[in-house]
Amino acid sequence: MYNKGDKRKTTLKQKEDNDMAEIKVLALDLDGTLTNDQKEITPRTRAVLDAAIDRGVTVVLASGRPTAGIMPLAKELGLDKKGGCILSYNGGKIIDCCTGEALVEKTLDPALVPELCAFAAAQDVAILTYNNEGVVCERDKDEWANKECFTTKLPMIHVDDLASYVNYPICKMLIALDPARRDTVCAAGKKQFAGRADLYPSSPFFIEAVPLGVAKDASLAALLDHMGLTRDNLMACGDGLNDRSMIAYVGVGVAMQNAEQPVKDAAVYVTTADNNHDGVAEAVEKFILREE
């Protein structure tokens, strides 16, 4: 359904069958958007994306997940052969699926790692990051931290002292916690790390800690510049608060029916179907394949 009450959204509806810019890039959030709650791409959504790719649309998988947690889905969609990109760590890294080349990579200031770990300890919540093998965390039995393993299909690796363990560049850290505490802890983190790192929610139980200025919209802007395209050529679908920036930025921003309200408010279109019922397929058929 169209999100009414915004002149830009009304204009898009009027232009839909006429002079709307050709969509050449499709950015898709994964969890709660492209995948269902079992973290799978449904057959219908896969078929619709295949049709879009065959029409020359470049698919970008844009997620807070680490690159290793996105690559299996990229290969499932054939992006390693047909072309496409991975935007991982909420935009901290952009990878060309065919070549493996990193087009963009931004890492956290190493000095912030022990402070972030201390902040999490003071809040009595789990904090994690990644290495080449999986998810790295002191609280390896934590219910909320293990949701990242379920999401990414990566193993949990226990370390005794995360701050000392991380002696390599990282693109982000992730705070995992009871949803009832998310907003309070996030507000405290924003205050403590203001001007040095960005903290924002990406799910009911995750708070991202990323380099200052890293967000999906900024990284997509860099990718579009690399491709010689404009945001009018870009469509994006998402559901979480970390998707709001890209939904507001792109030419056609789509929120899933299951999206958080601020994301719906930023979108030009809200799907009638949620992520468990092919919401992405609905949006792609409507705006790219133009099926009513």
What are these model-derived regions, one by one?
Residues 77, 82, 90, 193-195, ...:
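Short, structured coil segments at secondary-structure junctions
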Residues 119, 123-237, 241-245:
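Conserved acidic, metal-coordinating active-site core of Asp-based
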Residues 56-60, 81-84, 172, 232-233, ...:
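Short active-site oxyanion
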Residues 24-37:
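Asp-based phosphoryl-transfer active-site loop
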Residues 2-19:
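Short, Lys/Arg-enriched N-terminal segments with co-localized hydrophobic residues
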Residues 43-144:
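Active-site phosphate-binding/coordination module
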Residues 52, 120, 190, 263-264:
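A generic structural signal for well-ordered alpha-helical segments
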Residues 21-25, 42, 208-292:
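Mg2+-dependent phosphoryl-transfer enzymes with acidic/Ser/Thr/Gly-rich catalytic loops
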